[in-house]
Structures are given as structure tokens and as C-alpha cells.
Amino acid sequence: MIDQARQAAALTAIEAALGAGAVDRSPAVLARYATPLAIPAGVVLPANEAQLAVALSAAKGAGGILQPVCNGAHGLEKTGLDKVIVLDLQRMNRILEVNEDLAYCLVEPGVTFRELDAYIKSKNFKLWVDFPGNPDESVAASFVERSAGYTPYSDHSLMQCGLEVMLADGRLVRTGMGAMPKSTCWQLFKFGYGPWVDGLFTQSDFAVPTKVGTWLMPEPPAFKTFMVTVESEDGLAPLLDVLGPLKLNMVVANGVAVGNALHEAALLGKKRSDYAGQGPMAASAVEAAGKALGLGYWNLYGSLYGLPDNVSILWDLVNGAFGSVPGAKVIADGRGVDPRLWSWRMGTMTGAVASPPAAIAQWSGNQALTVNPVSPVDGEDAMRLYELSRDTCAEHGFDMVSEAVAIWRSANHRQFLPSTGSDKSSAARTRACAEALIGAQAEAGFGQVFTEPGLRATVDKTFASGGLSTLHTRVKKALDPTALFASA
């Protein structure tokens, strides 16, 4: 339980130090960060590192607790704790450098993918920005949360290079080659000298990111995007059995998305109320919903890149491989697919940063909680995860609305649980389903790759063996001994 008097004192101290413009307590603003179960005490909006250091010092002196976010807050569990002070870094939004020749950028935490893409286009740089589907997400947040996109640069943790964070005591730390004053390789060589610590500042409450470097993809000479649909629910296994070797051997190098029919229908603005019946839809109804939109039960999106002749050779291989899947249809021209979906999906794989046609959450609500398990890119495992997740969702009255993104040897799954955000009973039902999913998936050997603030304690319990939680606790005590930054 957070001490409200201390939070009020912390906000007053920050306001006194930085001025009224740096703190917002208005109900309209708090509502953007609130959930039915948690309302922040206020929002602090530093404009630069100097103001951030002052805010941390003032909050620490008053015994306040802060929850840092890079640019707004997203998802149903946007605030993990009731009466926490949100430290929103959206005003720290400078694009510090974009280097076309070496294909990297250095940005502050408030910079979004849309803003970075617009800057690159304004300079006519031949560089692509990989984004995880939401163009208004912060580039830094995507690294911190270990998000994934859809180009060959889909693994945002892997493509991050160079980091600056501010510790709870106001000290700035540059990682990797950034620790060397005259380094020429801060955004070029990830590891620097000595222990590599960048990962400590992802999915943690140890510090606040102030600068993040990331690699950008040079525009390739040629590419070929494609889609593969499979009609039946059980077609997921053979589809991924073909995809696995193609990913492992880097034939299909991008972050390959595989969305079920309901996920793709939701992207097109369809709602549960558009279909007959009540409660979770049966497999036959999901299949019919996909077919009506020119989609399969499963819909895979991939792309090939390189020299024109090489792309042509690889296309013959890939087309034949996916064509061997029972009930599969390989589409390379978008024929029969809604042009809005085709354009957006193909764009995500070719550096076109844009909003999707519609928001997934509106399938049956206005917000969504996500559960994010990881599986091997293997048909049997992926099907096992899907079936147990589908059944758990059905037990709680939810449809299975899901997408997986295959990156290297694993697939990151995003399972959406839409909810009416202003309704406490709806939010509680959604959270109960999410907790049940996390537990069932852990029992089956599938761990989470990301979770929203309000579910961290639930996920932490599934990673309790092997001494990892003890190590995290020791690091937290060393870097933030007064727990200035919130642990949900």
C-alpha cells in the first residue's frame, strides 16, 4: 500500500523544484494512465536530464514512489500500483543522431517510431525503421519491454546498441563503449569492456533510460513480401514445421507474423457483435469468419530481401515449401485480401511505419490486456500452447485473439484480452483470465517474454527458481535502495 501523504508531499516538492508545468494532477490527464483498479496520484513530465535529476531528488527526499514510462502508457494495466506517481518521459523527445552510412540512431526516450520514421524520410535516408505494430510507441520503450517487429531487424533488444540511464541517486551511466569518453563506436559495438549490463535495464525498475541507440536497416536492393493462409485450426502445426527450418537457416529473415482469423478480423475493425451467437466462437465459426474476409484460420506474413536474383531464387524455394502445407494458399499479389490489411501487413515488413487499420481492443471492448508467452518455432509446441490458451480463454468467456512473431528460433505470442476499461468487473474478469493463462502456460513450460505492470508479480512467481529472483532483488537493493522506482 502506497502512503498517499508521502506521494502528495513528493508531488509538491517536485512542483516547487521544477514549476507547475512539470506536474499534472488534472483528472483528465490522470485518466489516461488510470485503470479501474489503479489511479495515479499525479504525472511528472521532465523536459530534459537536468529536470529529471531534480525530480528524482525531490521525490526521493519526500519518500515518494515513481513509475517511469517512456511515452504515455498503453494497455489495460497501465499503472501497476494505485496512487503511484507516473514519471512520463514523453517531453524528452530529441532525435540526437541518425547516421545513414553506419545505419544507426541515438534517441531520447520520448521519441516514437512515427517521429523517427518522419525524420529519416525528411532527410531522404535509405534506412528502414522496424516497429512492433504501434507507430506511436516509444523507440526506447520497445527496447525496455523487449518488443519485436516484422523486418529482419525485428528483435529490438538485439538491435539496441548503446544506452544511457539515470540511477535513483541522479547519476548518469553510459553502457558499452559509451563508458569510454572519446569512443567512436558507442552505437556500433554493443558490449564495450567488462560485464555487459544493458539487459539489467529492460523490464526492470532499476533506473530510468535517458538515451537509447539502435541499429536501423539499410534499404535492400530488392524484396518480395508474401502471405500464406491455412484454412483449418489444426493447420498451425504443419505451417510452423515448414517455417522453422526457413527461419533457422535465415531464408525468411524477417519477423514472421502468424495471426489467427479473429486477430486479422479485429485489425480490419470487425467486432464480436458482428458475428452470430454469444460467448467464445467455435473453431468452425472462426474459420468461416476468416473465409469471408479472404483469410485463413491462420495467416502468415513473410518477406525475402537481397539482390534481385537471390530473391527470385529464394522465392521459388519458399513458394514450394509453403505450398506443400495441406490446405495452404500462398499469396504474393494481395488478390482476394482486403487492401487495407494487405497494405499495412506488407508495409510492416518493408519499413512503412503506419497505424493498423483498426485497434485490436475494439473486438469486444476499448482496451486490451495482453499475455505474451514464447514458444519454439515448432508445430507441436505452438499447437500445444495455442490449444491450452484457447481453452483457458474459453473458460473465462474470451475469444482467442492472437498473433505470433517468429524471431530466429522462437516465436513471441501476443494474446489479446479485450475489456471495457472503465468497468471494474470487466477489468477484474480480464485480469483473472490473464493470470490463469500465465499459470497454465508456465505449468506447460511456456514463459512470458513481457507483461504489463499490474501482472508483474504474477509472472515473477513463474520465474522463481534458479536463483534469478534473488539476484534481481540484490541488484535492486544496490541500485535503488530506497525503492524510489515502483515494483508492481
Where are these regions (language model features)?
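FAD-binding subdomain of flavoenzyme oxidoreductases
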Residues: 96, 109, 114-248
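C-terminal substrate-recognition/cap domain of FAD-linked oxidoreductases
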Residues: 228-232, 237-433, 451-456
